[in-house]
Design a protein with these regions (language model features):
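Accessory DNA-engaging acidic/polar modules
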Residues: 1-94
């Protein structure tokens, strides 16, 4: 399985959680039919605006879907956090 560093995790102005990998592009992720999408312009995976799931649920789901696409995404000390509360950051990093 390929690994890639997560360079940024954030919540955008549309209230979608996004995860930005350093190198890997997930242009065909729509084929998984998992509600995880790829933003080809900004180069990140993203969820829909949460309704029944929390941001933590969506984070875990995106990570699993990426692994199903043969890529393990890894948080590093260089990962940037945008519009993420300290509580959510702590939960994600557990």
């Amino acid at each position: 399985m390929e690994t890639d560093n997560i360079i940024e995790i954030g919540i955008d102005n549309l209230e979608r959680l996004y995860i930005k990998p350093e190198k890997v592009k997930f242009t065909l992720i729509y084929r998984t039919a998992t509600e995880v999408h790829w933003d080809n312009e900004n180069h990140f995976l993203y969820s829909p605006k949460p309704k029944n799931w929390t941001y933590l649920d969506w984070y875990k789901h995106i990570i699993i879907v990426a692994e199903d696409c043969n890529c393990k995404l890894i948080i590093t000390e260089k990962t940037k956090w945008k519009n993420i509360s300290e509580k959510l950051k702590t939960e994600i990093c557990k």
